[in-house]
Amino acid sequence: DVIKPTVITQNLTVSLDASGSGSITATQVDNGSTDNCTIATRTLSKSSFDCSDVGTNTIWLRVTDVNGNVDSASAVITVQDVIKPTVVTQNLTVSLDATGSGSITATQVDNGSTDNCTIATRTLSKSSFDCSNVGTNTIWLRVTDVNGNVDSASAVITVQDVIKPTVVTQNLTVSLDA
C-alpha cells in the first residue's frame, strides 16, 4: 500500500476557560478523513491554546495509515476570550482638602480584580469630589480586559469635610455714653 490517506478537516472555535486556556483533539478537527486500508494515527501540529492565541490560528492535522503513508491538511482554529473580568472593589473615605476638593484613582478602589487573560484598563464613573458630595456616594469601577470584555462593580465613597473653618475677626472700637 502506497496510497496516502485523504485528510479532511473542519475549522473550529475554541473559547478560553477561566484559567485562560483551551484545547482541541485531532478527532474534533478530523471531518471524515479516510484511507484505503486503516488510519493508524491522527496528530495535530498544535492542540493547546492560551490568551496569546486569541484570533485565528492555522494548524495541521497529520493522518498516518497502518502502512506508514502520511498526509496532512490545514484547519483554522479561532480562539476567543469571552470571559468578563472579575471586578472586586473596596469602599473608601475621602477627606476634602483646604480648597474643598478630593480625588481617588481606580487603583485605590480596585481590591484585586482579575481576568483570565490580562486587564487592559480600569476606569471610575467618578473620581473627583467637592463640598457638594459630602456624605456617601456610589461610584462604579469598570474593568476592561485586553480582548474587550467588560464588567463593573460599585463602591461607596464617603466624602468628608474635616477642615475647620477659619475665623477672621476685626478689632472694633466701642464708645460708651457717659
Language model features with spans:
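Proline-threonine-serine-rich low-complexity tracts
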Residues: 1-178
